[in-house]
């Protein structure tokens, strides 16, 4: 059995299923380049049958991103397999991943047309899996099969399914704990059962895919490795459906720091973990909690006096890995208004941003404007500055999404032109706002409310044509000092879908306005490019239309 672990990153597919985490195509391509820098083995880029945007993302990543295998997801349906195969057609190193549910609860809920009895339905599921694998092999010789909700599947039936899948030619067999139900010992037993029933365990790669509903995703993944799995499916920051997926950074560093306990290797460039985490956070609008293992801002911080003393004397007293090993700074480099161009662009290059010479003047002016509003500029500020910086040339050279790009890389429907706030002595606020439309028109509205943010959002609601409901508003400081930037996150709902917007500014009222407009643009873009993906609470992806 190999001692090398295949890292299968599904941030762009399963990670995007987290409510509000939808990403534009340019954002996905940018993240895929970051994942390539990280040296992951496989990037699951999307689910092509679901929408043109998903197809475009898969095709662009397959043709533009060198290094990792590009994977596309498909149900065990002919149209799905064809859509995935065609999206991958121009790629040089590709995989097609097909799946079908195998647990009794899924079979009873989703497969009425496959038979009258459970036995008939199970037999039909095996036949569909085999046909799908055979069809997928006409597009690529790298085919993965997943038994959705394997964690709650009858072990005997699971063995029948994976045996048939292996005999049909699947090269990777994935055993998902789709609902995060398994305990580590149970998941170990399940994978050992699968290994024992495979006709030739060395002929296929056994894979894990663990969700975090009980907080056990990383533990179950590591248990799966001990049971013989040699591929792990995971996401940056652990994002994903419901409580999320196993976090790539946690798995990789567990295997690195505790190599003695697992005796396997993952060839990941760990110094890129934190920069990649920050990129995904900026694209999705999901902040990384400070105490998040490996990539959180507090992961290498010490406040207790005895800990500080110990670390100053010898870092290994309280640290089992180095901050620099995972791309965090042992000592934060601070920039300010007196920082020169050399210092700024050296720092940006260290963060992974190679800005073309022709665009450096504009970016340096943006930096000076920020530095004038803040005494010190931190890495978090620079990350957001680069995420916000517009221009097709810079976007092409750096992989950055253009400023304000909507889904599929289109022009955003709304741009905040100007606004003003007037406060009265009785705490009532009056706001005037002007929005610029993508057709060149502008609309001005006024509103009053209980405080500036309430009034601002009422005015914006009057100025837009997209019906929606405000679900959540939060603000936090994302850099240091009294002049710190505030990051505002806004979530709005339209129907069953949620859309998240974020913005950062030293002026939190402006950040509140820009975050709301960001969320509105994502809503409008989603309506224009009507995604046909259907998500459910308890699955990898809803198997609709069966």
UniProtKB/Swiss-Prot annotation:
Residue numbers spanned by region Regulatory domain: 415-546
Pathway: Amino-acid biosynthesis; L-leucine biosynthesis; L-leucine from 3-methyl-2-oxobutanoate: step 1/4
Cellular component GO terms, alphabetical: cytoplasm
InterPro entries: 2-IPM_HCS-like, 2-isopropylmalate_synth_dimer, AIPM/Hcit_synth_CS, Aldolase_TIM, LeuA/HCS_post-cat, LeuA_allosteric_dom_sf, LeuA_bact_synth, PYR_CT
Reaction catalysed by this enzyme: 3-methyl-2-oxobutanoate + acetyl-CoA + H2O = (2S)-2-isopropylmalate + CoA + H(+)
Main location (coarse class): cytoplasm
Record-linked SMART domains: LeuA_dimer
PROSITE patterns the record matches: AIPM_HOMOCIT_SYNTH_1, AIPM_HOMOCIT_SYNTH_2, PYR_CT
Domain annotation Pyruvate carboxyltransferase: ranges: 5-274
Compartments in which it is found: Cytoplasm
Domain of life: Bacteria
UniProt xrefs under PANTHER family: 2-ISOPROPYLMALATE SYNTHASE 1, CHLOROPLASTIC-RELATED, HOMOCITRATE SYNTHASE-RELATED
Family: Belongs to the alpha-IPM synthase/homocitrate synthase family. LeuA type 1 subfamily.
Quaternary assembly: Homodimer.
HAMAP family in alphabetical order: LeuA_type1
Protein name: 2-isopropylmalate synthase
Name of the coding gene: leuA
């Amino acid at each position: 059995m190999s001692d090398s672990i295949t890292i299968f990153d599904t941030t762009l597919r399963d990670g995007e299923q987290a409510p509000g985490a939808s990403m534009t195509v340019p954002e996905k391509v940018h993240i895929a380049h970051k994942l390539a820098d990280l040296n992951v083995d496989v990037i699951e880029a999307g689910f092509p049958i679901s929408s043109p945007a998903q197809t475009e993302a898969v095709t662009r990543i397959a043709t533009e991103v060198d290094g990792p295998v590009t994977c596309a997801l498909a149900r065990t349906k002919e149209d799905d397999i064809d859509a995935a195969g065609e999206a991958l057609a121009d790629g040089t190193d590709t995989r097609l991943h097909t799946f079908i549910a195998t647990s009794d609860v899924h079979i009873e809920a989703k497969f009425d047309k496959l038979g009258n009895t459970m036995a008939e339905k199970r037999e039909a599921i095996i036949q569909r899996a085999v046909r799908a694998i055979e069809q997928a092999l006409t597009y690529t010789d790298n085919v993965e099969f997943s038994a959705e909700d394997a964690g709650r599947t009858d072990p005997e039936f699971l063995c029948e399914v994976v045996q048939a899948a292996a005999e049909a030619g699947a090269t990777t067999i994935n055993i998902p704990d789709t609902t995060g139900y398994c305990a580590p010992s149970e998941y170990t037993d399940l994978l050992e059962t699968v290994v024992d029933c495979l006709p030739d365990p060395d002929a296929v790669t056994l894979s894990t895919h663990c969700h975090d509903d009980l907080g056990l995703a990383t533990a179950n993944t590591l248990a799966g490795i001990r049971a013989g799995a040699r591929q792990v499916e995971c996401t940056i920051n652990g994002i994903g459906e419901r409580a999320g997926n196993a976090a790539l950074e946690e798995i990789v560093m567990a295997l690195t720091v505790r190599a003695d306990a697992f005796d396997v290797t993952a060839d990941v460039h760990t110094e890129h973990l934190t920069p990649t985490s920050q990129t995904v956070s900026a694209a999705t609008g999901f902040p990384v909690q400070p105490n998040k293992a490996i990539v959180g801002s507090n992961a290498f911080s010490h406040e207790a006096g005895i800990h500080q003393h110990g670390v100053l004397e010898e870092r290994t007293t309280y640290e089992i890995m180095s901050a620099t090993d995972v791309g965090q700074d042992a000592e934060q480099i601070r920039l300010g208004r007196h920082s020169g161009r050399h210092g700024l662009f050296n720092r940006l290059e260290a963060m992974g941003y190679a800005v073309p010479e022709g665009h450096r003047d504009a970016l340096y002016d943006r930096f000076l404007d920020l530095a004038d509003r803040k005494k010190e500029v931190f890495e978090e500020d620079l990350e957001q500055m680069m995420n916000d910086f517009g221009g097709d040339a810079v976007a092409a050279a750096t992989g950055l999404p253009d400023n304000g790009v909507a889904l599929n890389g289109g022009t955003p429907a709304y741009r905040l032109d100007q606004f003003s706030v007037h406060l009265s002595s009785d705490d009532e606020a009056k706001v005037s706002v002007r929005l610029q439309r993508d057709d060149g028109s502008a609309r001005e509205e006024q509103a009053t409310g209980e405080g500036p943010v309430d009034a601002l959002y009422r005015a914006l609601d009057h100025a837009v044509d997209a019906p929606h409901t405000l679900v959540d508003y939060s603000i936090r400081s994302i850099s240091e000092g009294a002049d710190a930037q505030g990051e505002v996150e806004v979530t709005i709902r339209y129907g069953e879908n949620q859309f998240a917007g974020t913005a950062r500014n030293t002026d939190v009222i402006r950040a509140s306005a820009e975050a709301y407009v960001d969320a509105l643009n994502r809503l409008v873009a989603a309506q224009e490019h009507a995604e046909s993906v259907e998500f459910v609470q308890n699955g990898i992806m809803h198997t609709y239309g069966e």
